[in-house]
């Protein structure tokens, strides 16, 4: 690994942030494609019930994946901070302790998803025609949760080291295997939603094996010994950083599950249309998401090196990048959303329902560029409790109540329900601007 390229404390901010962000974005694109392939193949070669099952079941899997990713953010930020502070000896202990913690988390999730797959599907209000298939999808994905958690842990480690290219390779391997698996199991053997779930698990397993091989061959600036594999102060510190983010993400994703349940009550076509729209949304949100992940590592290194001015400059640079791309995505989603949804299904009613949701959601692709850049900046400063608070306000006090209100109107439609997301984000921006002003004054006073 060329450590000069992973040093964010000097050189052009725009160049270094962009070069680090591009592989992160590439990995996120492939992850979104990874999930989209399941819907695409099931939509083309499976049943409408199978499509609904993958749509609803993938919401549950997304909940688990996003929560684990936020837990892992604590590891990414802390590794980057140690690098900025030149504390290389602490990194091995952090990784060893984190491995133990994530193994425990995996075991808990495994038991819950296997034992409670049917109640979870019922709670999600999956259409009765798709209830059994949804439970099967959740159960199979639960069986492979160890691989999903391991992938996110390994990716967090590499990104903390300033290496965003390796996680891109990991997910590229998984994406290729998943496509092959879907074509064989769904298109070839007609296993419908179950086949999509099996392909997902197998692809993640191969990806983890590849990642471990790469890690063992890599020359790293630290050592890991068997004595590091225990719960220690370093992994506890990472948990303190990641836990608020994980809690916030958990409740945010639960709100999306609740939204899925609200929409499921509108019928099978609305359920399937929303599922297809979510895949488009996943792609649309990739740039702000990659900005947030990249910003956390970039800012953490500079904070560790004592360069707050550079950290702030990085945040505003990220906003500029995100806004430019966000406008392009906004126009595409708003005016060509029906063409995008038609990629995943040939059923006209489902295409129109998906496009209806995208019309309401479209503004989110612009405003999130600002919000996520600020969130990444705060994460790099260890201000994860605030990130949790502002996220919960958006989720529990704005997005969820507004979505529910829209869903119970006499002529409820997906466009109005989709509006809840950008409205909540705008509220979040206002809150974060206020906190940014407060934090800047506090740091200025402390350094006076």
Identify the role of each PLM range.
Residues 26, 30, 34, 64-68, ...:
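Residue-level hotspots within pore-lining transmembrane alpha-helices
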Residues 8-40, 44-45, 59-73, 78, ...:
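N-terminal transmembrane alpha-helices
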């Amino acid at each position: 690994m060329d450590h000069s390229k992973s040093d964010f404390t000097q050189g052009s901010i725009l160049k270094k942030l962009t070069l680090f962000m591009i592989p992160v974005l590439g990995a996120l694109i492939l992850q979104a494609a990874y999930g989209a392939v399941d819907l695409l193949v099931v939509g083309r070669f499976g049943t409408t019930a199978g499509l609904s099952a993958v749509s609803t079941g993938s919401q549950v899997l997304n909940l688990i994946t996003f929560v684990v990713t936020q837990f892992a953010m604590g590891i990414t930020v802390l590794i980057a901070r140690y690098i900025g502070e030149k504390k290389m000896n602490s990194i091995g202990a952090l990784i060893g302790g984190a491995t133990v913690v994530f193994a425990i988390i995996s075991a808990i999730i495994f038991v819950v998803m296997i034992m409670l797959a049917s109640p979870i599907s019922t709670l999600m209000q999956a259409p009765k025609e798709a209830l059994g298939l949804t439970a099967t999808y959740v159960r199979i994905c639960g069986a492979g949760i160890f691989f999903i958690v391991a992938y996110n842990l390994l990716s967090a480690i590499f990104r903390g080291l300033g290496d965003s290219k390796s996680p891109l390779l990991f997910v590229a391997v998984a994406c290729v295997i998943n496509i092959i698996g879907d074509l064989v199991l769904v298109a070839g053997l007609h296993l419908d939603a179950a086949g999509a779930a099996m392909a997902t698990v197998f692809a993640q397993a191969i990806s983890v094996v590849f990642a471990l091989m790469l890690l063992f061959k890599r020359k790293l600036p630290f050592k890991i010994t068997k004595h590091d594999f225990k719960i220690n102060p370093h992994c506890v510190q990472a948990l303190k950083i990641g836990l608020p983010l994980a809690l916030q993400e958990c409740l945010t994703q639960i709100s999306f599950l609740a939204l899925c349940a609200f929409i499921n009550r509108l019928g099978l076509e609305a359920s399937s249309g929303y599922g297809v729209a979510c895949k488009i949304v996943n792609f649309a949100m990739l740039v702000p998401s990659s900005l947030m992940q990249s910003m956390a590592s970039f800012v953490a290194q500079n904070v560790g090196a004592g360069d707050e001015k550079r950290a702030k400059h990085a945040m505003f640079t990220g906003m500029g990048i995100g806004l430019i791309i966000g406008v392009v995505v906004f126009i595409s989603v708003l005016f060509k959303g029906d063409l995008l949804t038609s990629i995943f299904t040939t059923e006209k009613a489902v295409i129109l329902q998906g496009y209806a949701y995208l019309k309401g959601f479209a503004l989110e692709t612009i405003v999130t560029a600002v919000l996520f850049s600020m969130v990444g900046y705060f994460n790099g400063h260890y201000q994860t409790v605030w990130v949790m608070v502002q996220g919960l306000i958006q989720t529990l006090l704005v997005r969820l109540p507004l979505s529910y209100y829209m869903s119970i109107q006499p002529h409820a439609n997906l466009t109005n329900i989709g509006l809840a997301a950008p409205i909540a984000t705008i509220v979040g921006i206002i809150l974060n601007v206020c906190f940014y002003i407060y934090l800047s004054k506090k740091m200025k006073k402390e350094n006076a």
